[in-house]
Amino acid sequence: MAKAKFERTKPHVNIGTIGHVDHGKTTLTAAISTVLAKKGQAIAQSYADVDKTPEERERGITINASHVEYETKTRHYAHVDCPGHADYVKNMITGAAQMDGAILVIAASDGVMAQTKEHILLARQVGVPKIVVFLNKCDFMTDPDMQDLVEMEVRELLSKYGFDGDNTPVIRGSGLKALEGDPVWEAKIDELMDAVDSWIPLPERSTDKPFLLAIEDVFTISGRGTVVTGRVERGVLKVNDEVEIVGLKDTQKTVVTGIEMFRKSLDQAEAGDNAGILLRGIKKEDVERGQVLVKPGSIKPHRTFTAKVYILKKEEGGRHTPIVSGYRPQFYFRTTDVTGAISLPAGVDLVMPGDDVEMTVELIAPVAIEDGSKFSIREGGKTVGHGSVIKTSN
């Protein structure tokens, strides 16, 4: 059967529910789809539909994640809900489902719990720009003073982790009652979605960002010069644009003299294109796979950085033994792999497979990276971890 064509009539946004176990994330996800389905903006999903999450094999790790699709008046959403805490950690660190924003679910009856804090911190580290709070189970915890107290605590926590705690929308509702069709609580879901529409920013389209192409191959066309090929990760490139070649060696400046795709010449290449770029005055030996072609000044080479890393379990094809400071695996960024030595934080002697940790890495050669850059860690031909750069330093 042919797949239905995706009609792009509204801007698309990826969001997810985050928060402590049993605070009602999955019930809320089901409630959103059920309430919006009544307006023809979603297909209703029951708790069981959302809960029977398909296993996704994403970059060698198993992530259980459920994707629900729905629309509001102004936007189209893909909503990810993960059943287990470990799945959220993996999902967010690897960027398996990039979140443009998140709905933090907190049970009014429990308040802020350990995973509430961890998910907020993780959201900050992986670059989720804004969070909307849904204070759940308000049909059960009816005391407004208690609800006020929890709201105050959440706002302080958001501010502590660098979010705008004072202005973040906090909606008080009941996912369960809304799912059961109680109109008072259904209205709270509408209120929540209005807040999501207005508070969570539309993601910047990749074409609006500064140009970056990860170089996959280099060859010479006699009489014309050196061509680099690769996929345009973001931005737009035009003939005669000035570009920099960054990473592995000293940064070089050059000018684009031609752009080709499918053996046809183009005026410009944009995000998503696999293109060949002809460069002025560059010898084949001056450039290599693993470097990036970028808009001048938009990204710098770094040898040291701090990252949030998830170490794969042995069942996920990872190591059987823990890692310690001084461990020297390969770090894979885009089209390059570079050896690096890790340093664990003070007081952490080792990291077990299945754990996540913040670590500092020192590479043997500089690589073009920035906050949020994703990478894999490999040794002996197998992937042993995934990470996300939190902070670069020279």
Curated annotation (Swiss-Prot):
The keyword Protein biosynthesis applies. Mg(2+) binds at T26. InterPro entries: EF-Tu_GTP-bd, EF-Tu_GTPase, EFTu-like_2, EFTU_2, G_TR_CS, P-loop_NTPase, Small_GTP-bd, T_Tr_GTP-bd_dom. The keyword Metal-binding applies. Residues 10-204 form the tr-type G domain. Pfam families: GTP_EFTU (PF00009), GTP_EFTU_D2 (PF03144), GTP_EFTU_D3 (PF03143). Keywords: Cytoplasm, Elongation factor, GTP-binding, Hydrolase, Magnesium, Metal-binding, Nucleotide-binding, Protein biosynthesis. Residues 19-26 are annotated as: G1. Residues 60-64 are annotated as: G2. Residues 136-139 are annotated as: G4. Residues 174-176 are annotated as: G5. Residues 81-84 are annotated as: G3. It is found in: Cytoplasm. Its main location: cytoplasm. GTP binds at residues 19-26, 81-85, 136-139. GO terms for molecular function: GTP binding; GTPase activity; translation elongation factor activity. One of its GO terms (cellular component) is cytosol. Transmembrane segments: none annotated. Belongs to the TRAFAC class translation factor GTPase superfamily. Classic translation factor GTPase family. EF-Tu/EF-1A subfamily. PANTHER family: ELONGATION FACTOR TU, MITOCHONDRIAL (PTHR43721:SF22), ELONGATION FACTOR TU-RELATED (PTHR43721). GTP hydrolase that promotes the GTP-dependent binding of aminoacyl-tRNA to the A-site of ribosomes during protein biosynthesis. Monomer. This is Elongation factor Tu.
